[in-house]
Amino acid sequence: MESLDDIVREIMSCRKCDLHKTKTNYVPGVGNEKAEIVFVGEAPGRDEDLKGEPFVGAAGKLLTEMLASIGLRREDVYITNVLKCRPPNNRDPTPEEVEKCGDYLVRQLEAIRPNVIVCLGRFAAQFIFNLFDLEFTTISRVKGKVYEVERWGKKVKVIAIYHPAAVLYRPQLREEYESDFKKIGELCGKKQPTLFDYL
């Protein structure tokens, strides 16, 4: 089986599309290579491009906070994107870019073989749902629902939620977002810390 390190090395010298010409850093992914849960976003933004790590800006801060709310740290999970390079001006990925770069994500998932895959936002959900032959309509329709697929000789849970950037942009989604993370915590056998956990 291919190792995650081998895939990351290949990403770091990728020339499959023109995004490598405009990026500052490749952003392959970060976290635990034996993670039970993988979070998949759309593409690196400005902060991620500068640092070479996914979800390090304001959206990343919210993601880290939500992980902590269910007793997880970034080091416990694996975080990546469909695209490994930033599209100029944060424009939407093109179908060609998704097709060429998406292969890396498929191989990353194959190397990690998680029990839970969380799609952060519409692009990630479209890609993952397509990969697992699940019907995707809109993010608001599939959001928060748990789908079960057979993969790697086991049952894998797939859940789509809003991208953290959408929650920052629309604070009224926050309560719903927290509820979705509780559900993710339950899928991983985690619960929200209570006051008694700190006594």
UniProtKB/Swiss-Prot annotation:
What would be the name of the gene that encodes this protein? afung
- List of residues binding uracil: 41-43, 55, 81, 163
Q: To which protein family does this belong?
A: Belongs to the uracil-DNA glycosylase (UDG) superfamily. Type 4 (UDGa) family.
| Description of how activity is regulated | Product-inhibited by both uracil and apurinic/apyrimidinic sites.
Reported impact of residue 101 to A? Shows reduced uracil excision efficiency
Thermoactivity: Extremely thermostable, maintaining full activity after heating for 1.5 hour at 95 degrees Celsius. Exhibits a broad temperature optimum for activity around 80 degrees Celsius.
Could you tell me what reaction this enzyme catalyses? Hydrolyzes single-stranded DNA or mismatched double-stranded DNA and polynucleotides, releasing free uracil
Q: What is this protein called?
A: Type-4 uracil-DNA glycosylase
Which organism is this entry from?
Archaeoglobus fulgidus (strain ATCC 49558 / DSM 4304 / JCM 9628 / NBRC 100126 / VC-16)
Q: Name one Pfam family in it.
A: UDG
Free-text comment on this protein's domains from its UniProt entry? Contains a pseudo-FCL region, a large solvent-exposed peptide region containing an alpha helix and loop anchored on each end via ligation of two cysteine thiolates to a [4Fe-4S](2+) cluster. This region is involved in DNA binding and catalysis, particularly in duplex DNA contexts.
Effect on the protein of changing residue 91 to A? Loss of the iron-sulfur cluster
Q: Which GO terms describe its biological process?
A: DNA repair
Claim: 4Fe-4S is one of the keywords in the record: yes
- Coiled-coil intervals in this record? none
Which molecular function term from Gene Ontology is one that the record holds?
4 iron, 4 sulfur cluster binding
Q: Where is this region: Pseudo-FCL?
A: 77-114
Do the record's keywords include Iron? yes
Q: How does activity depend on pH?
A: Optimum pH is around 6.2.
Which UniProt keywords are given for this protein, alphabetically ordered?
4Fe-4S, DNA damage, DNA repair, Hydrolase, Iron, Iron-sulfur, Metal-binding
EC code: 3.2.2.27
Stated role: Removes uracil bases that are present in DNA as a result of either deamination of cytosine or misincorporation of dUMP instead of dTMP. Can remove uracil from double-stranded DNA containing either a U/G or U/A base pair as well as from single-stranded DNA.
